[in-house]
Structure formats: C-alpha cells, structure tokens
C-alpha cells in the first residue's frame, strides 16, 4: 500500500494536562481512520495538528514523504482539508457564494469557472436546488454536505472530519456514510473524529483511541 500520511510520536498538552502522547499512525491512500475518546480529550486538537493549524509539543507529520512544516501552509490546507463541527459557513453568503469564495480567493479561479465546478458537485450531492439558499435556511444534513463540498472543491488528498454526524438524524447519517465510502473509493484519505463509536466502527478501517494522557492505539 502507498503511504500518504505518517504521524510519528505526536504529543500535545495544555499546561500540565497531556491530551495525547506518542501517537504513531501510518495512513495509505483511501484509508478511513476513526478517532474516538471522551469529550475534551484532544480529538479536535489532533486534527488541527495534522493540517498545521496547531503545533504539537513534539513529534512529526509527513505528507507524501515531506514534513508538513516544510510545506507552504496555503498549499498544505488545500491538500489536507478540514470540515469543522460547526461547518464554518458564512451566514451572510448564499450556498453558491460560500462554495466559490475560496476558489476565487485562493486558487484565483474566475467566477464562471468556479460556479461551474461548484454546481457540478451540488448536482452530485442532490443539492442543486439549494444554490441560492442561505445557511440558516438549510437543515443540519444539508449544511454538513455543503461544508464537505466546499472542502472537496479545493482538491484535497486528505479530509479531516470533526463530528460529521453530530445532531444528524438516521437518514442524514446514512448519507454521510455513503459520501465517506465514495471518497475512500476515490483514494481520498479521511480522518474522522466522532463520539459515536458505532458510526466509527462502521466507516473506519483503523481506529485510534485518544484520552487524557493516553497513547494512541490502533
């Protein structure tokens, strides 16, 4: 199998509290890794370390063989995208503008091309009728899928999902499961944080347990 991410001895603490220590993990293209642990144990912090938003106390992360500290941060966050629990959608923008703003600002894509790319994914995710809706007009499941689409538009090879099924009903959870399955089949690697262990067991081929002062366990 071909490695895309190597995490070596990753450790992070806040003050005297160790969140996680000596986490070792190798990820191949298309792997789906689940992270479970008690609330406040550092699962989201772990995700932020992986895409360079937070520096670990020690340890190393390699993306396609290169230390992430040596990769341009703008490029790194396109290669390793993150979907936060609260989705981080701009409430004053409609869906199509939420999806195209980064394409235009970061990738310098013109408006027509950006909108064509966004509409293509909206159709694929059965959300084309929502392109002019605002975030407060969307259901939780729709907001989640819009946030995933926005990340996909940047062309990531790794996607980090923070509690992707929180507050979703069974139907929307199943839709998220299908999305994860398809992304994995397309060789996109996923790291998923969730408090729902049954969901993690269903979607993941590797599981890490993170707790206060615990080592990561696969």
Residue ranges of model-derived segments:
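Helix-to-loop junction immediately C-terminal to a conserved catalytic motif
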Residues: 51
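Conserved signature/switch motifs of ABC ATPase nucleotide-binding domains
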Residues: 133-136, 154-155, 186
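The feature captures the beta-strand-to-loop junction immediately N-terminal to the Walker
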Residues: 36-38
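H-loop/switch region of ABC-family ATPase nucleotide-binding domains
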Residues: 194-195
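Conserved ABC transporter NBD signature motif
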Residues: 59-67, 76
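Catalytic Walker B motif of ABC-type/P-loop ATPase nucleotide-binding domains
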Residues: 159-162
């Amino acid at each position: 199998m071909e490695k895309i991410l190597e995490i070596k001895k990753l450790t992070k603490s806040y003050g005297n509290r160790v969140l996680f220590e000596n986490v070792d993990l190798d990820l191949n293209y298309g792997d789906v890794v689940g992270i479970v642990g008690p609330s406040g144990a550092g699962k989201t912090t772990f995700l932020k370390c992986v895409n360079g938003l937070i520096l670990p106390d020690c340890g190393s992360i390699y993306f396609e063989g290169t230390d992430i500290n040596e990769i341009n941060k703008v490029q790194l966050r396109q290669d390793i995208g993150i979907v936060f629990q609260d989705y981080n959608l701009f409430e004053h923008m409609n869906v199509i503008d939420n999806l195209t703003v980064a394409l235009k600002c970061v990738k310098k894509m013109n408006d027509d091309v950006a909108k064509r790319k966004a509409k293509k994914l909206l159709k694929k995710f059965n959300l084309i009728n929502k392109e002019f809706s605002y975030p407060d007009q969307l259901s939780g499941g729709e907001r989640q899928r819009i946030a995933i689409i926005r990340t996909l538009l940047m062309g990531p090879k790794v996607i980090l999902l923070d509690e992707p099924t929180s507050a979703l009903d069974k139907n929307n959870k199943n839709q998220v499961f299908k999305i994860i399955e398809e992304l994995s089949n397309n060789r996109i690697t996923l790291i998923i944080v969730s408090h729902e262990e049954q969901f993690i067991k269903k979607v993941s081929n590797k599981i890490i347990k993170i707790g206060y002062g615990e080592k990561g366990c696969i």
